[in-house]
Structure formats: C-alpha cells, structure tokens
Amino acid sequence: MSRRLLIILGPTAVGKTDFSVSKALEYGSPVISCDSRQIFRNMSIGTAVPSASQLAAVRHYFIQSVPVTQAYTAGDYELEAVALVERLFDEGHETLVMAGGSMFYIDAVCNGLDNLPDGDSALRAELWERLGKEGVGTLAEELRLKDPLTYSQIDTRNSQRVIRALEVCLVSGRPFSSFKTGERRKRSFEIEKIGLTRPREELYSRINQRVLNMIDEGLVEEVRSLLPYRDCQALQTVGYKEIFEYLDNKIPLEEAVRLIQRNTRHYAKKQLTWWRRDPDIRWIDL
C-alpha cells in the first residue's frame, strides 16, 4: 500500500486553502495544516484560518490547537505532525494532504530537525520578557557573543529565531550552530510537494485586498482582545505587531494597514525565494 504525503505549499494569499480542500476531498484525506500562525488560538482573523464552510467540508488538524500563551517550535511540530501522519497511514489512508506556508515547519517534516537539547520554559519566558523590555537588538548581540556563526546566518530581526538560538546556547552551554548536522531524516512515507504560484502583481493585489478584508472582519478588535498577551511568541508576527502600534497611538490605522500589506508582501517574496531553491517542488500556476 502506498503511503504518500502530498504537501501543498506556496506564498501567503496564493490560494492554498481552497486547493488543499479540493485535494483532500479527492483523496478522502483530512487537511494537516502546516502553518506556524494558524496553529494558535484566538488569532483567526489575522492569520486567515480556513472558513467555517472549509472546516466543515474536511477535517483539519493543527488549526487553533495551541494556546496563544504557549511557546511552540518547529521541533514540537515535527514530533506531533509526523506522529499524526504515521497514525493516519496506519489507519488506511494512502494519500494525506498537508498544506501551509511555514518554511521551517515544512522542512521539519520533510528533512527533520537537528537533535537540539530540551528547552527550558522558564528561561524562554524570561527571554520573551526581556524582549519586551530591551528589544531584539540586545538579545541578538548576546547571541553574537555566544554564537557568531548562527548570528551571521539568521535574520536577527526575527525575535523568535533569536530567542530559540539563545535559549539553546544558555541551556546547553554550547553554540546553537554546534548542533547542526545537516543530515536528512528518513521517513516511512513518500513526500510529494506541489507549489502554488500566481503572477506577482496578482498575488500582491490579493494580499492587499486580504488585509482590507481582515480590517472589515474585525482585526482591530481581535488584536485589542490580545493586548494582555502581546509579548507572547505567537503575537510577534505581521498583522498583530502593526495593530499594537496603532492601539498604542503610535501610528494611524491607515499606516498600520499599509505596513501590514507591505510586510506581508515582503514575507511572500521571502517564501518564494526559499522554495525556488528546492528542485523537488512541482509548481502550478493558478
């Protein structure tokens, strides 16, 4: 019996959800979400979770399953997602549909992550608290002193990446980079990757319109309800950081909207740059 994991990937707003639901119905599969933002609860508008009708049509996993206050890593996702995939194959599925745009989550499932030491939740909480008070630059400088190689390789403006690397350094007493082996983990199932794309101007137009739709659907109110948790890992992301700035009276709403649109377009470009290097992806123009 074949055991094929069909991974549908692509930039934000390209149309992965509709495509994945249609494929799931075709193969009698659930949709296994591979999205590092949609996995958190209480963030439905700003992360564009599947609609009620889409969720009703096909069972979805890893949608709003983790509390917004909980730190959750690509390593956590690898363990849980691979275990789920194995179980569903054992139950008789021949093809399973996974869909998402989170590069590190997809890489974790396909190739596995290096065996990092167990995290320290108390230390992680302390680092996130420091982030709120001192800013990511201070933590990045601490990482540079402990692990110059990792500092030179990651986006040091990405607070989540900086904190994860620094946590490993502090827990282990070793540089984060010393745990990187580059070895691919073998899976007991075949992996097929389909990448979705659109002409750039069309994709950017869809992104801009999606942000306007989010505002109409109540994004500001959603972010306001999350103010007590604004320093949590889950909320250090596009669509929330900008609205927090607006709620702090630092920028007008129109500027927050413009920044969300711009930052989302930048993220889409980053996603495509990352995946274009992967020769195993079969691209489909929508």
What residues fall within each predicted segment?
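Phosphate/pyrophosphate-binding catalytic cores of soluble transferases and nucleic-acid-acting enzymes
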Residues: 1-286
